[in-house]
């Protein structure tokens, strides 16, 4: 049995097909939304337009790589997070496409959230199959969240901590755009950071399970004004994010000892952050970039789980 996942976030249009019998992702595709040089993202109306324009061709591409006539359920990100009042218009494009696809074939439509998709993709790809069935601490770190969550799979989520102001992805993107890189700028900031061989000493603000990242933007601006080069400042920015996560994770582990700690979200694609955190947090799980950044893989997996089609008893 195949399931189709659709996610239309403020960053990318994403589709994925999951095979419940094999327990594998058959194929996936993603297209970043076009952002003009110097801008930090799109207005919601523009994001909705670009998703609507991209989806037909992307579904056609997906159909060339998988037999969509074998899809038996459709999952879609209908809103950002599974909390009351969570809403962004960009997700309407995905809901519209998913609804049309499911109705045309009399298939069940499963409405999920963008955050649940991130969590499911990370748990699936973390290298330990049991993670998707048991309790874990999950960080969702992106341009719109810096959340620490207590999760049982991706279905039962309890918020534990977050940023009180700026999100990690916002800090990274603002630095990257300031340096002249396209949005989203995470990959370029990571490339620059890898060029720096100097030691940096990040200064962070963490109180229990809550962090503050608003000072990071000002710190980076001051470092640039003081004459530090781009690689140094990029490394400083990413290690500040890394040290923030280390402190939040270890504080959470003091309250929930022994739990695995899984890192999801686009910012967690950084090799520098991955190395820094895994050396300091026990039982930390990072995943390959395509499972960390925006994707529809987790949504296709959750559609299968909601239908009771995966995991199968033979696995």
Question: Model segments located where?
Answer:
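Glycine-rich phosphate-binding/hydrolytic loop that grips phosphoryl groups
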Residues: 118-122, 287-315
């Amino acid at each position: 049995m195949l399931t189709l996942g659709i996610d239309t976030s403020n960053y990318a249009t994403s589709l994925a097909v999951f095979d419940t019998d094999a327990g594998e992702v058959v194929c996936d595709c993603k297209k970043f939304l076009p952002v003009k040089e110097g801008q930090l993202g799109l207005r919601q109306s523009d994001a909705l337009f670009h998703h609507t324009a991209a989806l037909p061709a992307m579904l056609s591409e997906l159909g060339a790589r998988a037999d969509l006539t074998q899809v038996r359920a459709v999952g879609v990100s209908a809103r950002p997070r599974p909390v009351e009042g969570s809403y962004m218009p960009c997700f309407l494009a995905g809901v519209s496409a998913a609804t049309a696809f499911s109705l045309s074939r009399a298939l069940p439509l499963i409405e999920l959230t963008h955050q649940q998709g991130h969590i499911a993709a990370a748990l699936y790809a973390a290298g330990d199959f049991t993670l998707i069935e048991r309790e874990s601490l999950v960080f969702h770190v992106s341009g719109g969240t810096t959340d620490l969550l207590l999760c049982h799979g991706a279905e039962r989520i309890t918020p534990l901590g977050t940023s009180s102001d700026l999100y990690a992805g916002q800090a990274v993107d603002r630095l990257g755009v300031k340096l002249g890189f396209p949005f989203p700028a995470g990959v370029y900031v990571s490339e620059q950071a890898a060029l720096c061989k100097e030691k940096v000493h990040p200064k962070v603000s963490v109180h229990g399970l809550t962090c503050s990242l608003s000072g990071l933007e000002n710190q980076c601006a001051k470092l640039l004004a003081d004459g530090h080069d781009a690689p140094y400042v990029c490394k400083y920015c990413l290690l500040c994010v890394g040290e923030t996560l280390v402190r939040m994770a270890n504080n959470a582990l003091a309250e929930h000892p022994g739990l695995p700690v899984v890192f999801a979200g686009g910012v967690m694609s950084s090799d520098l952050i991955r190395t820094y955190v895994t050396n300091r947090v026990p039982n930390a799980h990072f995943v390959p970039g395509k499972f960390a950044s925006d994707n529809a893989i987790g949504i296709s997996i959750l559609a299968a789980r909601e239908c009771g089609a995966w995991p199968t008893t033979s696995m």
